[in-house]
């Protein structure tokens, strides 16, 4: 089979006659293609017709022929497709519907529809988010989403719970930046935080037994009675608490020390034990745990060092790998060195070794000394923990543990370290805590490491030493402190060494530099100095090579330098406890000292604490300091109020009961009783406080209601209570009783007209009971036996023969307490009340003391001339009621009117004399008509008192 390209008479196709191809267009001859390639020969450029191409280009043209062959088959397929057309069903035919459903299910998803679906889904999501936000905004007030989330504070608490030692730095650390000589800030070097010792299981360790009770009472102590022991403790100002504390001693011979220790004590110039030593040493020798609290310079150090020596000498000697027997823990390096020197002084009598372990010293030297063996280790908490972790020593042989200045260690953040040290020591150890101040919170923490402790307190907790004279200088501003110090520094150095306290390290360096410029030789001590420098400064200060030492609070505790005579608080302390320790550097061991504190007007907060500290130490408090302290609100509120106290109004009704004026309350100037016994009866004890008072109040309100709310008609007969105005109100608020019966009209002669004789006290007693008033009058009483002034006798029980001034005083009292305090009543009292100008006094002036009988006769005659139609036999309140109903004058109708009370007792009718008495009497009646009984008062007649 041959392939025929066609052309000159030859048919195109394969060389078999199976099919024929229709003739098409004649193929046009191909134009010669001009090649622009670089392979074209040079001859072709010059009109050569021969087409010379590279071999690979010819291959390419041959490929083009193959493409033509392939197109032939494509044309054949197109022709065949036109012949065999697919079946296309008609519209709406079942086959078309099946094809549609099939194509819909089998066909791929349209991209546009997929994109639109995505857009709709995203829009729906956005709408849902917007709706949720709207709901959150609507409920934002009632719902807090941050409750479930951990805020900064909760994160801090969680972090502190997971890291209990985080952020615990000594108190002497300052946050301020230090600067070099060029003024560039020095990066602060933070101290390494010391982790506490890990817990230890003491049940897995077998400790050898030891003895800790070495105290035997002296015969002189045993022979003392408990009362003598109590008196001695009171004399020494000691307070001891705890289970079975041992008796205190009063001499070194009572302690039972051997001759070697006593010789060393005498060599140290000790003459007699201090109060804390008198009680503390017996407790320590007995093997008991103790909390010792005493003022600075009271000998606390010797109180635990001497028992240590006795305790150590009873135990076996140290082996090469053994640790110490006694450990003394203190907060500062200076205190550590000082206690170490004391231990060496007293320990050399027994050839005992002591090692001081503190921060800043050579770690290698301290570890070498510990490995060689030492019975006593005086340390700071952090450095001891370092040596224990590095296996330089161990605490298995420790049986005597002392924490000096325990509250200071807890305040400095050493609580966890202190607890870990105590937990690493055997549980049956002996533990002692000493301090000058001991807050209750720190005491509670300290009791956790003690077993049945005995608390020994000398003086008040945190009080200042009375041997120290404290002087407080109040200056207007800070620069004035410098002027004050430079003027007095030479005077201070002439008496002894001077210690100047400054709060901040930068201020201490600045003050020291300024003093050096003024040619004052001094030393500087603060926490950022190297330990060698600090040791050299303290050594020079003790040797008196430098008279002045400027220091921060690192020198405030435990620094025992006897040459210090003056302490100057250039800056006030952070708290009053630090102030107590500051001034305690002087006046030690019974010596006298002076402490100056410089205050400015801005430091009123500390002034309040300072006032209490001075008062507790019996020091003088200046008026300027007290005024400055009073500027502080908490001190002003908590300060006691000096001066006279408020007088309590204590009546028969109970504490704070105040008698109401205008209701017949007793005055302090006038008595209402007729004799002395009546006043005494008013203060009879009541059977029940609340019961009597309640009943008295009920009766008082009931009587007041009946007195005030009466009939409006003047002709209405008044009830008995409306005219019972002679009974005064008692302190319990009750009304007095009145006679229950009256003598018949006309039985008594006109001259006699006596009042009730045995009217003891017009009112209730303090217990709310009725006073004794007779229920009737005697049948025949002469006027000479019962004068008119009997009812209104003085408090001392004056008889009828007293002068008329008594009537005048009582009339004044009735006018004050009986009348109402309304303006109308006061006006009537002022113009028409004749009680202050009673007829008895005026009649006494005219007749030279004729007596009250003539006054009463004249009064009765005058009253009869006025047409008041009084009956001679009736002298009580009943006549007053009938008389007021006839005359239409409401003089006796109101219980508030003092005239009604006076005339119901039968006395007011004898108060008027002559015409003057008539005018006064009528004016009184007309002025007293402003009551509830008569709504419209009548016109008042003009009297002589109107002018």
Swiss-Prot record:
**Molecular function terms, GO-annotated:** ATP binding; ATP hydrolysis activity; mRNA binding; RNA helicase activity
* Claim: Oxidoreductase is one of the keywords in the record: no
Give the superkingdom in one word: Eukaryota
Which top-level enzyme class is recorded in the Swiss-Prot or TrEMBL entry? hydrolase
Signal peptide range in chain numbering: none
Coiled-coil intervals, chain numbering = 112-152
GO (cellular component) term, any one: cytoplasm
Its GO biological process annotations read: U2-type prespliceosome assembly
Note whether ATP-binding occurs among the keywords: yes
Return the Gly residues bias intervals.
1-18
Motif stretch (Q motif): 250-278
Instruction: List all Basic residues biased stretches.
Output: 938-947
Q: Where is this region: Disordered?
A: 1-54, 68-114, 176-200, 731-754, 797-947
According to its UniProt entry, the function of this protein is described as:
ATP-dependent RNA helicase that binds to partially double-stranded RNAs (dsRNAs) in order to unwind RNA secondary structures. Unwinding is promoted in the presence of single-strand binding proteins. Also mediates RNA duplex formation thereby displacing the single-strand RNA binding protein. ATP and ADP modulate its activity: ATP binding and hydrolysis by DDX42 triggers RNA strand separation, whereas the ADP-bound form of the protein triggers annealing of complementary RNA strands.
What PANTHER family is this protein classified in?
Answer: ATP-DEPENDENT RNA HELICASE DBP3
What protein am I looking at? ATP-dependent RNA helicase DDX42
Give the organism, scientific name. Xenopus laevis (African clawed frog)
